[in-house]
Amino acid sequence: MHNVNTTTTGLSLAKILASTELGDNTIQAGNDAANKLFSLTIADLTANKNINTTNAHSTSNILIPELKAPKSLNASSQLTLLIGNLIQILGEKSLTALTNKITAWKSQQQARQQKNLEFSDKINTLLSETEGLTRDYEKQINKLKNADSKIKDLENKINQIQTRLSELDPDSPEKKKLSREEIQLTIKKDAAVKDRTLIEQKTLSIHSKLTDKSMQLEKEIDSFSAFSNTASAEQLSTQQKSLTGLASVTQLMATFIQLVGKNNEESLKNDLALFQSLQESRKTEMERKSDEYAAEVRKAEELNRVMGCVGKILGALLTIVSVVAAAFSGGASLALADVGLALMVTDAIVQAATGNSFMEQALNPIMKAVIEPLIKLLSDAFTKMLEGLGVDSKKAKMIGSILGAIAGALVLVAAVVLVATVGKQAAAKLAENIGKIIGKTLTDLIPKFLKNFSSQLDDLITNAVARLNKFLGAAGDEVISKQIISTHLNQAVLLGESVNSATQAGGSVASAVFQNSASTNLADLTLSKYQVEQLSKYISEAIEKFGQLQEVIADLLASMSNSQANRTDVAKAILQQTTA
């Protein structure tokens, strides 16, 4: 059983009830004390009831309960009644305080309204007076204008009469008449001047009154504005002070939502601007790499096409030489390919054993004095001709070198025939003169040769074979000479095939270089494409993050709205209980 200290509690309650001025803090403290006492009393009553119930059950078989008259309230019951009365009194005090606050607020509003009405009446009165004075002032201004006009007309008439009088004879009757008119007009002018003076004085008086009223009106308007601003500031301050804890939390939540939304939007804008800048830079880089890749692929294709043409030209020339060799050998050169290969092997063995190549010694004078300068001369001529046709300088130089080498190969074939026919010494003696003659002749004939080569190729081969057969028939034994020429021509074919293979290999290497550069650019382009895809992914993530933050903001708004709705419901319930 709880022991309630009613003495201490009673003293506190007595002090509270004896107080004539109960503020909000006092009422709250009283409510807390009353609730505590009520809880303790209920617990005490519950304990007593449990004890009585236990005793009744234990003696149910022995004692029969008897009816007794109701007892008066014991100490606990009296305390409960006291607490109930206290709660009622505190509630009434709270309602009284609220009513007093509302009454004070209404009185304040009525005072402000009365003050506003006073300002309004004063302003309206001053405004009406100002408008009346303004109308009077306008009338006086018009009168002044009319008076000035009248005086001016009289002065003009007097001036005209005076001018006329100066022209007339002094004894003339008309002059006497005009003199009388002048006197009358002068009298009227003096009267008009006096009237204007009176009008001007009245106008100045009205002007002074109008100025005073205008200043009073402006002063009242300024006072009213200051009063309205002060009242608004006081009302706003009162509203801010009246905010409860829940309203303050709601206000803080709204401020937080505003800051989060603004920060989220600015962050998204910054991210999008950064990603867009990066995308633009990567786009420019990809376009540059794409152009470089296309250029390298184009170079490789052009080189493959050129080297294919060179291979076809060399193949055709080697076919021509093979046909010439077949003409000398009666077709036997086709079966003697192994013999040509054996000669090359023999030349390699002799060179390894003695250090000298008999084929190199035989062709050395012609190569140094004729072939090498001739190739250079022809290459330069082909290059200049191609540049004149509008071909790029670098490409023209490369193609000119190839065509010069081909022409040199043709001369080399002729040199092989020459060595086989007239011998090493004669070839050495004739090399220099032949080189000059052939160089000059071929330089002059290059354009015509390129233009007419395809149409005159058959005739050229036929005439060359006929002349060479005739020359060889006059020089020695026909069969032996033809076999020797055929052998050397076959060697020339093998050499030409080697040159062709080397040329094709060089072209393949150059093409591979271009293709390697193209592959590098393609790899960079692929990397840039991947980076752009990553940037797009980052943009999507930024937008998704923005959406998530917006969802958080929406949840906060919903929580704030629910809190405000609960607060409104509580306020409605309190208002209903108050009005009831």
Curated annotation (Swiss-Prot):
It is found in: Secreted; Host membrane. One of its GO terms (cellular component) is extracellular region. The keyword Endoplasmic reticulum does not apply. Signal peptide: none annotated. Its main location: secreted. The keyword Transmembrane helix applies. It is a multi-pass membrane protein. The chain crosses the membrane at residues 313-333, 399-419. The core secretion machinery of the T3SS is composed of approximately 20 different proteins, including cytoplasmic components, a base, an export apparatus and a needle. This subunit is involved in the formation of a pore, called the translocon, in host membrane. Component of the type III secretion system (T3SS), also called injectisome, which is used to inject bacterial effector proteins into eukaryotic host cells. IpaB/SctE and IpaC/SctB are inserted into the host membrane where they form a pore and allow the translocation of effector proteins into the cytosol of target cells. This is Type 3 secretion system translocon protein SctE. It comes from Shigella dysenteriae. The lineage of its organism: Bacteria, Pseudomonadati, Pseudomonadota, Gammaproteobacteria, Enterobacterales. The gene is sctE.
